[in-house]
Design a protein with these regions (language model features):
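Catalytic-core regions of glycoside hydrolase
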Residues: 198-199
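Hydrophobic residues within beta-strands of alpha/beta enzymes
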Residues: 113-115
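Acidic/aromatic-lined carbohydrate-recognition and catalytic surfaces
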Residues: 1-99, 103, 107, 118-192
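Active-site-proximal substrate-binding groove within the catalytic cores of carbohydrate-active enzymes
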Residues: 203-233
């Protein structure tokens, strides 16, 4: 932390908050599997996996993985892969954990926060578990807390979704300060490959101007590659 504090004097430090899931190798998950009091209900565990056929996720693997906890078998929620299990935000202790974590980062000079895979955060039975109102409320809370600490903070949401869904994370200027502009990379690639900028120009002209204190986070590729879903609309 001494090094981070030193760097923050001359640079704006950005942190990736992996808020949706954790590795099964993490100490938090191992404590959960061992059914320790401080980690009980930290991750989503179910006895019945029926009623989740509508769930939208960018993977074809099974949504659930079986684990034994206290000599009982449970289905654990794995949005992305079976070595990553999703946090249970219906447990207030999980939210408090992340608030404390972000506060620690703030105290040590971090001022920009990227919320990883935030769109999948909240889960409800018989829904698609994507962009749910509760997820937006968590983003609003994070924005409020950051603003209370310092006006020099930024909140960025990573939501690799169709364009209109992505833009919803600006809220009423009370959620993200910036959203990843996920439609740009595939449209730019199409333009270069086809030698035709029509689609790119049409999209750019349709984009609403960013409101005060918000912006689009433009990029041309990421570690996840270039997805096509953001071009759906």
């Amino acid at each position: 932390w001494k090094d981070i504090k030193s760097l923050s004097k001359n640079f704006r430090i950005m942190s990736d908050i992996v808020i949706n899931h954790a590795s099964i190798e993490s100490k938090y998950f191992k404590s959960f599997i061992e059914n320790k009091t401080e980690s009980q209900n930290f991750f989503i565990k179910l006895k019945n996996k029926q009623g989740y056929d509508q769930v939208v996720r960018p993977r074809s693997s099974d949504l659930f993985r079986e684990f034994e906890i206290n000599k009982e078998i449970y289905y654990l929620w794995c949005t992305f892969s079976h070595d990553q299990v999703d946090f249970n935000f219906k447990n207030p202790e999980v939210l408090f954990f992340f608030i404390k974590l972000i506060h620690l980062y703030l105290k040590n000079g971090v001022r920009v926060f990227r919320l990883d895979a935030i769109a999948f955060l909240w889960k409800e039975h018989d829904t698609n578990c994507l962009n749910l109102p509760q997820t937006h409320e968590v983003v609003k809370l994070m924005r409020t807390l950051l603003n209370a600490f310092s006006k020099n903070t930024l909140l960025i949401t990573e939501t690799n979704l169709p364009n209109l869904e992505n833009l919803s994370y600006f809220g009423e200027n009370d959620e993200a300060n910036a959203v990843y502009n996920f439609a740009l990379p595939p449209l730019l690639l199409w333009t270069l490959v086809m030698g035709d900028s029509t689609a790119l120009r049409k999209w750019s002209m349709s984009m609403p101007p960013a409101k005060d204190h918000t912006s689009y986070f433009n990029f041309i590729a990421s570690h996840d590659g270039i997805g096509l879903r953001p071009t759906e609309g």
